[in-house]
Amino acid sequence: MDNEIVALCGFFVAIALVLSCISIITHLKNYKKPVLQRSVVRILMMIVIYSSVSFLSVYNEKIGSIFEPFREIYEAFALYCFFCLLIDYLGGERAAVISLHGHLPRPRLWPLNYLQDDIDLSDPYTFLSIKRGILQYTWLKPFLVIAVLLTKVTGVYDREDQPVYASADLWIGLVYNISITLSLYSLTTFWVCLHEELAPFRPFPKFLSVKAIIFASYWQQTVLSITNWLGLLNGTGWIYSLLNQNVLMCLEMPFFALSHWYAFRIEDYDTPTWLSCARLPLLKAFKDVIGLKDVWCDSLQTLHGDRYVYQNFEPGENLIPSRNDGRINRTSHGLRYSQGGQSKYWISRYDQSRVRLINNSQNSPQSNKSYFSIPGMSTSHFENGLQFEIDDEMEPLYNQAKQMRYGDYNYPVLLVNNTHASSSYT
């Protein structure tokens, strides 16, 4: 690579690194909302990693090839962090699902709107499928990177003496395209379904800034590969040196850094009216950002899906789903309504495998019932609450606490997903 091109890339990368590092340090020094800012800083670090690896590839291709797998993996990780940020803005997964309870389902995005019914994210199983659609790219990307490295080491990645359909490059690229398309489609579906709830948190510039860098990296590489295959980039001179994926990424990084600075500005998290809000020390905040225990636990829960059941995502209010299929699904999982829908309770279910065995052996209509009542636990028990003696001394304190906004004005509750704090807590 020409020295002039290397110097130009270094200048643009230096600007991007300065902007990103200032933004990251500012967040770490004002780490007042760890649940939100953890994901924000992780997203901002994508600029640092992209800029550094792209410049190393321009400066020395062999050195850059060593760090390129980390850049590819972090791209998928940043997409996961953005999804977590949207969830945390809404107060967590349960709050996000409950916020859509009773709302009409949304039409699916093209082209699945012609093939499937409208999507109802108030159903925890539908939410789980969307989340898995987003995270599968994060899970799959490390294996794709390993596959590329192994095929390059063994010399079968893009051999010229083999047909195109037998090329490892073709099949790895096909799996990659399907995976990232599914992930971006699922993320867009989630954003469209909850755009009204996310509106106070300025989701569009955040969504655009994260998606832009991924799209730029992907489509530029695709276009350059096609033009190179057609023999259009076989010339010499500085113009052909500029038409390089890593060179283009270096030149674009300052603009991506500015977009991330605006989208994830510190003013959304550093609220001056929060006089009693503490923050973590700088090193502790950085340690919290680079820790991956939360990612590991969330990935295991999403992969297993055991906690994504109707009982865990049913609102406390007596709201009935807007569509019949939503009520049928909850009823089939043990939810029962009483008093004309004014109250509800859950009953246990038989093991469905046993139900099928009973049906086959007895062939009785009564065996089709897949639910039973728990002995000693009648409907009135669920409706009337727990049976215990009321303490005459404690009850007035509970009644006074219920009249306060947060239970106790000496210890105000600060919601991490509220970007505009009130100046008064009482």
Swiss-Prot record:
This is Vacuole membrane protein hfl11. Vacuole membrane protein that recruits ATG8 to facilitate the degradation of vacuolar integral membrane proteins during early-stationary vacuole turnover (EVT) when cells enter stationary phase. It comes from the Eukaryota. It is found in: Vacuole membrane. Keywords: Membrane, Phosphoprotein, Transmembrane, Transmembrane helix, Vacuole. InterPro entries: Ostalpha/TMEM184C. The gene is hfl1. It is a multi-pass membrane protein. The lineage of its organism: Eukaryota, Fungi, Dikarya, Ascomycota, Taphrinomycotina.
